[in-house]
Amino acid sequence: MELIFISILILTFFAGESKNLRFSVYCLIANSLFIVTSVFTMGFTYNITSLYWIAFLDLLVRVFIVPLFILKSIKNRIHSEIKPTISHPLSIALSIVVLSLVYHFMGIFKTMNLPQVLPSFACGITLFIYGLYLLISKNDTVKMVICFFIVENGIHLLIISLIPHLPKFIEFTLTFNFIVAISFFLYIILRLNEILVKEEIEKLRQTKAIHRLEE
Amino acid sequence: MIDIDVFIVSMVFISPILFASFVLLAGNKFTINKIFPVISILISIFCTILVWEKLNLSESKVIEVNQIFYIDGFSILMQLMIEIVALITILYSPQYLAKLYSHRQNKFHLYYSTILYSTAFMNLAFVLNNLFLIYIFLELSTILVIYLIAFNLQKEDLKASFKYLLFINVGILFSLLGIILLSYFTGTLIFLSNISFYVASLPKHIALICAVLFIIGFFTKSGLIPFHVWLPDSYSESPSPITVFLAGAVTKIGFYGIVRTVTVFSFHFQEIQTLVIILSSLSMFFGAVLAFNQRDLKKMIAYCSISEMGFIASALVLNSYIGILGGVFHIINHTLMKGILFFSTGILIFAYGSSKIDEIKKSFGNISWVSPMFFIGALAVAGMPMFGSFLSSITIFFALTESGFLWTSIILILSGFISGLALLRTAIFLFWSKKEQNQILNKIQLPASMVLSTFVLTFLLIIFGVFPEIIYPLLEIATNGIIKMSH
């Protein structure tokens, strides 16, 4: 189980720090596959059938639908992200510190002997905090959506850790909200891209017209 | 409670959902677009009043149904306010949209149905008992509003809506984290009916962590400083009726969240009260100061709104009856004041096509109805007597002073004065200062629905200021509901 969570964190790191947006999305897909595996494993280990359904839903939403949406939004643009606020080497160093420190620190909760809380809690908190750090440091709109995806993955794992205490439909409804939010994000990005492309074409036309007049 | 009562409670949110779906399916047919939303909101208002009657008859002044619904006076007050705001927004919109958003004519049905869905989810959130479910429906209603902010589909609108979506979604996730931690440390689901018991039993450091998470989440939702970044842009870029919907309904969801979580913490932990009052003072002061130099009328009102919301947040965490009463009353007055100001600005935009103060001044003609209503709104923001806002501000002032926060009450008076001054200065510049000699004064015809919507809000603001006993029963039951839940 621990290995799965560490793999999730490593893949999240690649998704967050990769300059190439397409590669980031592929990392997210792999990351989501590990999340599905972790949810399925927890369902099997603790004999909670609702987790199988949640794993299936995750497979559908986090592995297929949302990454496809994001890939669609980067279809007509340059695949490298807009320069972030923090320089790349510093960002990588900070990411490693944030991920390792928070995950290690959150291990304290494991000693608290809380009744029936699943082990995804520490990983969830780590993803949440790391996603927030990424959100602050990035400037690219698509990258921000990827960061939001990471924050949401964190919340998802936190909710999963409380599943024994929750009505089962809460996680399904939260996933629905997540899909709606991501859809709106991508709707806005696509519309913005359209406008930016139009503006670029208009600028190009004007420059050409000026050149013609000069000639 | 018998089934018929459950039916009435459910109709408050089912009616807008049903009618929104009709509007969505029917497309842009004239009568359906304009009549169905109004009918659905009227049904909701009627059912809310019936539930209020039931609540008045009950001994405990709380209606609980199978751990699903928790309805107290504050739920009723919020529902009524959101329904009235939605109704007035819908009535104001047709002419405004027809002139300024004619290029989006084929999407008007989506506009109305989004307002209805959002209202329905808010209404549902206000009667639920489980904190997780409250979060889910508050978030859903918030997300839907994106479509309305970005309705014009221009670059600036899209940027503003992206900012809104990002800040609100991430911000409100903090409150979800707060709920998760609360459940984690108590080992049980948290309901409004038991939140006070569990909060009181928490160790102090855990309670502080949870409360800070709730503060970040719901302060972001309300648009209070330092989590306000989304608010000025969203207010200024969205269509004016939607700005009123944002100011009167969407940001109020944040206050609902504050009342249901942060107020409970502040009743048990003095540190939370102090923290919230410090943050609120920042909002009051900086909101007013930032408003002063704005050249966009909508942004100026947005910053004044941030300042005013600081009043409300500071009052809602005071462990006293008059504090909570003042806060609840100011929620209503804030909605009315901002409604008047944004609707008046909407009329100016309708007439001159801009919300920039200098551009309006250049082309300003003869609009007979706007200036008095804008002046009333500005005077109310300044906290002048005769308006409801005077009574609520003065109540908050006394409550803060009594609770030992004299410095906050001084900031309150100061920021009210600065905000009022900023608005009055702009109003005098726009409506009273001498016009250039060669300027032609055109008589501009305004749609009756727009003027009437603004007039209704102005009338209510004055009525609540002169005859506060009209609104007092609702305020009393809401205040007692909050105090009962939090103790």
Regions found by a protein language model. Name each.
Chain A
Residues 1-215:
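Alpha-helical transmembrane segments of multi-pass membrane proteins predominantly involved
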